[in-house]
Swiss-Prot record, chain A:
Any one GO MF annotation of this record: signaling receptor binding
Disulfide bridges in this chain: none
Protein name: Protein cornichon homolog 4
GO CC aspect terms: COPII-coated ER to Golgi transport vesicle; endoplasmic reticulum; endoplasmic reticulum membrane; endoplasmic reticulum-Golgi intermediate compartment
Entry superkingdom: Eukaryota
Organism: Bos taurus (Bovine)
Subcellular location: Membrane; Endoplasmic reticulum; Endoplasmic reticulum-Golgi intermediate compartment
Family: Belongs to the cornichon family.
Keyword Transport included in the entry's annotation: yes
Assembly, per entry: Interacts with Sec23/24 complex components SEC24B and SEC24D. Interacts with CCR5. Interacts with ADRB2 in the early secretory pathway.
Length: 139, 1254
């Protein structure tokens, strides 16, 4: 059972890593002016909810399977994701808004955020991997 | 979706309005065609308008085989040339022949390098005779004088013609191209080869030298002066050095803003000298010379120094000695003299034209020109004509143009960074020593050089020279110089510093705000002038189009943070300009790496290369740029209009279009619901349109269309050939389609009759409508579909909340919260529908202008998104009614007139660039930011302002100037692709005091207002208000703790910031940010929209109205405008204490004028100006001043008219009696007074002081 949880977490984490990389690539494309803000934001906004769901799922799973440490580690990030999603003003087109992304250094902060998440997910990845192997061995 | 072909869409029915009469329904429906699909496909991609990254067509006109000249001697005869040149002048050009000739020559000379190689021979020709020399000098003097007139600084440069001439003679040497010519033509070919080779290498180094060796070369000219009245061959060697000096000059001038001090002081003397020399010389010289000179004068103003490198000089000296024989030329003296001027010219401007002429005139000598040359000349001529015509369009008279340009080449400035380091190294022996004495700051060896020359020249003794080019003479020259213009120059050289020191006291003078009772000046506040040297000041962009909040840019972000002041730009890029140089050329010269347009603040390293002032990359000067269409001269890249004007407009080539320029397309989307009909705007709009139909900007392709909507959407088929307009109704608002996509937007001229019919019919078509709903969203979608193939302007008239279909809105305003002091909600949009649509529109180059005429809440916050992101504009007429509210009706009428007839640019993009190290991070205005520095503007109008916030990313310690450039690429209504470029140059400072000294308080306030709007939308209004107060507190406390060492109990501010608290208080009481006073949400949002998109001048009046007392207008200090005397009453502070019952006051709030009449106002005034016998009989609502034939009435009216004319939108005039209820409107603008909810000015100061002390 334990192994299953971690296998799932591992896969989910992989997906999140890819997503983070995708965010970074797309944002840097925008930074370099390879794509315009509109298409960049519509691309990214599509993946905001999957990311949020994916991460919340792992977090909840850890809570259910009573892995407190991993749960607490994931909690702030999950909370941030949800907060960010909820706090989008009604007139905006999503977390990434093409009309504002170039203002007030938003692009940079988005980039920073994606980087941090990438690091976080990588960390999680190895933790899950380790835990999974441990679980498999224990089984 | 698509309508079935050939038959109306099921939902679409053709309705024939009574007025429209009998068009057959079938007819209407028949055309129903393909759905919207294709349109969209046609639509250009979003990226379309980006400026192509590559420009650079090779300059076609001027490519000439380099080998040309060498051929010359054998083939050619001068005669043909002469005849041609004669034709040129007389026939084609009013301009002197020499000028005319220039293009030809220019083309010939194309290969610069080769020219250099040839240079050495030139000395021969030059050296020949004193007589010739004189002639040359005279020409030079001519030039000088002519040049000098416009600008004093200029004169300095050239102070003494003599030097000039000397240098010029030298210059011929220095200037390879001419020299080459010369050598070939006149003297000895044999000499040529030997000499030429050495020179070639020189050419290469020369670039470097130019750059580095400023000091040394500069000195030389002086020396030259000193020595040589009559220069024989011996003298020549000396002349060689001068060319470097010139270069040097240029460089200095370029580099030099630090150095620039050369200004007026030296002038008088120099001028005298010039004149003297000139006359004497002229007499000496042949008549031909004089003629040539005079001709040349106009052309020649800016001379680029010949580029001989020091190396060259040495070589040359040798050569010159050998050349001595050239004296042989003398026999031909007249000729020689003639030629010399040309040489001079060449030296200066490298003007080949003259050169050619000279050659022609000097028939005897074999000249290099060939039959080939002739052909080329013709071609060039054409080119010349073209260019001249274009320039003439900008400014009819070339002369006036020059005046415009004003600065001659001294103006060409480079950032000091490039130039500052003197390097002796490149120079051969002579140079180094002189280099040292001249600090980079001492600017102008240039200016110096000339004066010194003169004396030398006059003396005509060569003693100094005897030594040849060596350094010693240089010294002497230098010293002389020092003595000579001495004081003047010193002072001028220190000019930059002086300016600072002189300006600082004033702008930094500590002001105790709490004790200064009358803080507001009596006259309008002008933008501070950046602390640059005179030449740069002259060249700098007008503050009306381009302003920076800090006219002294702090060196580092840390310094900026210490100052606690906002750093940003305020732009008004498309302002209506009375004078604008328009430039047509094949290649628009831009930096290869950062794509900056060439501008007055670049530095020319030599004639062939310029250094970008934003990224510091060294670029080549394209061949075409060497030719100056204004003066028709060649080789003066620094005199091109691009380099003489900080605001220019280019006609762009096809490189700058991704599709053919679009026609002007106007679509009117009109609300015709019951509410709208009730308000009655249709009558005014249609009337106004009918009147201005012919004045709509556009060409023969102009298209126009109409869409009306209530709960359904009505299209109008105006296809040419119909007997009457047909109305097509689409009731399927969930899935809007275009019934007849081809005939809804029609050519204005082909269908004019139908359009007029429709406009006449429209106001009465819906009089009996019962439809109260408004399907705005679907109507906009339809408009988008209609416009997307071409792009253009959509004018939307809306009178209520959209209540049907996509984009419907709910009322969000709670009237009870209007005067809440706590939270103001709903400042942001309720839905992203309008934003999305706006972005779609923006992608298709369509802008939506919103006219909101409503009496109730209409959620402007949401609707405005439509215009904000599509780069439209917003007009709001609260409680509009055509009879009940005549002042609004009149305002709409006048606004419409302006709106319909003002200039417009389509499919525009604006890019803002700034010097490396600075970066932009936030933009304010109506547009879509497409990439970090690129604003996408579907339309641009002359009333749109923008603001940009800047941060300093890298330290600017290695530069003393920063530049900002905005380039607005747009399609004019005539279908021309144009680029309007503004460049602003500002100094960098390292001390906090300087930063404070340079604050532009109005710009800072406007930028703060923009930031506060953002803050109140993204966060909350109270946050924004706090931020505003903190801005004052922080900046004043930072000033108090760092700069001012005066210990006062009061609140100390530098003089430059003394109005800061007042303006911030005004902002806090502005509709957009006020709390506690009942403010309707739409009013507030509209005020915010205006803050975002108004240019600074208009915004300032909104923030801080001007109050004048008008019952005692006098002609004292009056100005004359168009034969009218406009009195200029002093500004009064905005406080009730200034209002006396005996007076009448005019308050100018930007969009509204109030005239407040005191209770016991003089009856004479009331009678003379208002036309009523006494106070009691003045009506409550009065919006006009009668045209009475009395002096005071005339004065008052001319004053008000003058105020009105200064702004694009006509303000409404309200006459407010002291006791009328409307007076609260007036009194709420008295921002220095206390209101129930807000501080008085004094209280505010105390509050700030308290905060500082905390």
């Amino acid at each position: 059972m334990e192994a299953v949880v971690f296998v799932f977490s591992l896969l989910d984490c992989c997906a999140l890593i890819f997503l983070s990389v995708y965010f970074i690539i797309t944002l840097s494309d925008l930074e370099c002016d390879y794509i315009n803000a509109r298409s960049c934001c519509s691309k990214l906004n599509k993946w905001v909810i999957p990311e949020l769901v994916g991460h919340t799922l792992v977090t909840v799973l850890m809570l259910i399977s009573l892995h407190w440490f991993i749960f607490l580690l994931n909690l702030p990030v999950a909370a941030w994701n949800i907060y960010r999603y909820i706090m989008v003003p009604s007139g905006n087109m999503g977390v990434f808004d093409p009309t504002e992304i170039h203002n007030r250094g938003q692009l940079k902060s988005h980039m920073k955020e994606a980087m941090i998440k990438l690091g976080f997910h990588l960390l999680c990845f190895f933790m899950y991997l380790y835990s999974m192997i441990l679980a498999l061995i224990n089984d | 979706m698509s309508a079935p072909a050939g038959s109306p869409h099921p939902a679409a029915s053709a309705r024939i309005p009574p007025k429209l009469g009998g068009a057959a329904a079938s007819g209407a429906a028949a055309p129903a065609g393909p759905g919207p699909g294709p349109h969209q496909q046609n639509g250009p991609a979003q990226n379309q308008m980006q400026v192509p990254s590559e420009y650079g067509l090779p300059p076609q006109n001027y490519i000439v085989p380099s080998g040309h000249y060498s051929q010359g001697p054998g083939k050619m005869t001068s005669l043909p040339l002469q005849s041609q040149s004669g034709d040129y002048y007389s026939g084609l050009y009013t301009v002197p022949t020499q000028n005319v000739a220039t293009p030809n020559t220019a083309s010939q000379q194309a290969g610069a390098q080769q020219m250099y190689g040839r240079a050495p021979p030139a000395p021969h020709a030059v050296g020949s005779t004193p007589g010739s020399f004189q002639g040359a000098s005279s020409s030079a003097s001519h030039l000088h004088t002519s040049a000098s007139q416009p600008y004093s600084s200029f004169v300095n440069h050239y102070n003494s013609p003599a030097t000039y001439s000397a240098s010029s003679s030298v210059a011929s040497q220095g200037f390879p191209s001419t020299c080459g010519h010369y050598a070939l033509s006149t003297v000895s070919n044999a000499a040529y080869p030997s000499i030429s080779y050495p020179s070639l290498p020189a050419g290469d180094p020369y670039g470097q030298q130019m750059f580095t060796s400023q000091n040394a070369p500069a000195v030389r000219p002086i020396r030259d002066n000193s020595f040589s009245g009559q220069n024989t061959a011996v003298s020549h060697p000396s002349p060689l050095p001068p060319p470097p000096s010139r270069q040097y000059h240029q460089q200095q001038s370029l580099s030099g803003y630090s150095t620039f001090s050369w200004s007026a002081p030296g002038l008088p003397s120099t001028q005298d000298n010039l004149i003297r020399n000139h006359t004497s010389l002229a007499t000496a010289s042949n008549p031909t010379n004089t003629v040539a000179d005079s001709l040349s004068c106009s052309v020649m103003q800016n001379v680029q120094p010949p580029k001989s490198s020091p190396v060259v000089s040495t070589v040359v000296s040798g050569a010159s000695s050998t050349r001595m024989p050239p004296a042989a030329n003398r026999p031909v003296e007249p000729v020689a003299s003639v030629t010399q001027p040309s040489e001079l010219l060449q030296q200066k401007g490298m003007q080949y034209g003259e050169y050619v002429n000279n050659q022609a005139s000097s028939a005897p000598t074999p000249l290099s020109s060939t039959s080939d040359d002739e052909e080329e000349e013709e071609e060039d001529e054409e080119a010349g004509v073209d260019s001249s015509s274009t320039t003439s369009s900008a400014s009819p008279m070339p002369n006036s143009y020059d005046a415009l340009e004003g600065g001659s080449y001294p103006d060409v400035l480079s950032s000091s960074a490039s130039s500052p380091a003197p390097d002796p190294a490149p120079d051969p022996a002579p140079a180094p020593a002189p280099a040292a004495p001249q600090p980079s700051k001492m600017p102008k060896p240039f200016g110096y050089g000339y004066p010194t020359l003169q004396p030398g020249y006059q003396n005509a003794t060569a003693p100094l020279n005897s030594g040849g080019p060596p350094s010693s003479p240089v010294y002497s020259g230098f010293q002389q110089y020092a003595q000579y213009p001495g004081m003047n120059q010193l002072s001028s050289s220190l000019g930059g510093l002086n300016l600072q020191s002189s300006s600082q006291p004033e702008s930094l003078r500590p002001v105790n705000l709490t004790q200064e009772r009358n803080i507001l000046p009596m006259t309008p506040v002008w933008a501070p002038v950046p602390n640059l040297n005179l030449d740069l000041k002259k060249l700098n962009c007008s503050p009306d189009s381009f302003r920076c909040t800090l006219t002294n840019i702090p060196q580092t972000q840390a310094l900026l943070n210490k100052a606690k002041l906002p750093l940003g730009l305020l732009l008004h890029p498309f302002r209506d300009l009375t004078q604008l140089p328009v430039i047509t050329s094949n290649t628009i010269v831009r930096c290869r790496s950062c794509r900056t347009y060439i501008n007055p603040f670049v530095s020319f390293i030599d004639q062939r290369r310029w250094k970008c002032n934003l990224c510091y990359r060294v670029n080549d000067v394209p061949e075409e740029f060497m030719y100056n269409p204004l003066t028709r001269s060649y080789g003066e890249p620094h005199k091109r209009p691009e380099v003489q004007n900080s605001t220019v407009e280019f006609i762009a080539s096809s490189d700058y279009m991704l599709r053919p320029p679009q026609p002007a397309v106007y679509l009117f989307v009109l609300d015709v619901s019951h509410n709208a009909v009730e308000a009655g705007y249709l009558t005014i709009l249609c009337q106004s349109l009918l009147e201005n139909l012919d004045k709509l900007p556009g060409d023969s392709r102009t298209r126009i269309g109409f869409v009306t909507f209530d709960s359904t959407i009505h299209f109008y088929n105006l296809q040419e050939g119909l007997s009457q307009p047909q109305m097509l109704i689409v009731s399927d608002i969930d899935d809007v389609f275009l019934p007849t996509p081809d005939s809804l937007l029609v050519n204005l001229y082909e269908s004019k009759e139908l359009i007029k019919d429709l406009l006449n019919a429209l106001p009465n078509m819906f009089t009996n409508t019962r439809e109260t709903h408004s399907a705005l969203g679907p109507a906009l979608q339809a408009a988008f579909k209609l416009m997307s193939p071409t792009g253009g302007r959509v004018s939307l008239f809306q009178t209520q909340l959209p209540s049907l279909g996509a984009g419907l809105l709910q009322s969000r305003e709670d009237p009870n919260q209007r005067s809440s002091t706590k939270v103001v909600q709903h400042l942001g949009p309720a839905t992203d529908f309008y934003k999305k649509l706006a972005l779609d529109c923006s992608g298709q180059q369509t802008a939506v202008d919103l006219f909101l005429l409503s009496s109730q809440y209409s959620d402007l916050a949401s609707l405005a998104c439509m215009s904000k992101y599509s780069a439209g504009c917003i007009y709001y007429y609260p409680s509009f009614h055509y009879t009940h509210n005549p002042s609004q009706a009149e305002k709409l009428q006048k606004d419409l007139k302006r709106y319909l007839t003002r200039k417009i640019g389509f499919e525009a993009v604006m890019r803002i660039r700034c010097t490396k190290g600075l970066s932009m991070h936030t933009f304010h205005g109506n547009f879509f930011v497409r990439s970090t520095d690129l604003l996408s503007l579907a339309n641009i109008n002359p009333d749109a302002g923008f603001a940009v916030q800047l941060s300093i990313e890298e330290s600017l310690t290695d530069t003393s100037l920063v530049c900002f450039q905005t380039a607005l690429l747009y399609t004019s209504s005539k279908g021309e692709r144009r680029i309007r470029v503004h460049t602003l140059c500002l100094p960098v400072v390292s001390s906090l005091a300087d930063v404070y000294a340079g604050v532009d308080v109005q710009a800072a306030i406007c930028l703060l207002a923009n930031m506060a709007v953002d803050r109140s939308i993204s966060s909350s209004l109270s946050d924004a208000r706090d931020a505003l107060v903190n801005a004052v507190v922080d900046s004043l406390s930072a000033y108090g703790s760092t700069v001012s060492n005066v210990q006062h109990s009061g609140l100390i501010a530098p003089s430059s910031l003394k109005l800061f608290p007042l303006y911030v208080l005004a902002l806090l009481k502005q509709k957009a940010f006020r709390t506690g006073t009942s403010t309707r949400l739409d009013d507030r949002v509209y005020a915010m929209c205006q803050i975002k998109c108004q240019p600074l001048v208009h915004l300032m009046k909104m923030i801080h109205p001007n109050l004048y007392r008008i019952d005692r207008l006098t002609d004292e200090g009056a100005i004359h405008v168009n034969d009218r005397v406009v009195p200029q009453p002093p500004l009064q502070k905005l406080s009730a204490e200034k209002l006396t019952r005996e007076g009448a006051f005019l308050m100018d709030c930007g969009s509204v004028f109030y005239i407040w009449i005191g209770k016991s106002c003089d009856n004479n005034f009331i009678e003379d100006v208002l036309g009523y016998p006494d106070f009691a009989s003045i009506p409550q609502k009065m919006t006009h001043l009668p045209e009475l034939d009395t002096l005071s009435s005339e004065r008052a009216r001319s004053f008000i008219t003058w105020l009105r004319d200064s702004r694009p939108l006509s303000p409404v005039l309200h006459v407010v009696k002291d006791e009328s209820p409307a007076k609260t409107e007036f009194f709420q603008h008295l921002i220095e007074d206390r209101t129930e909810a807000a501080f008085s000015y004094y209280e505010f100061l105390l509050h700030v002081q308290q905060q500082i002390c905390k």
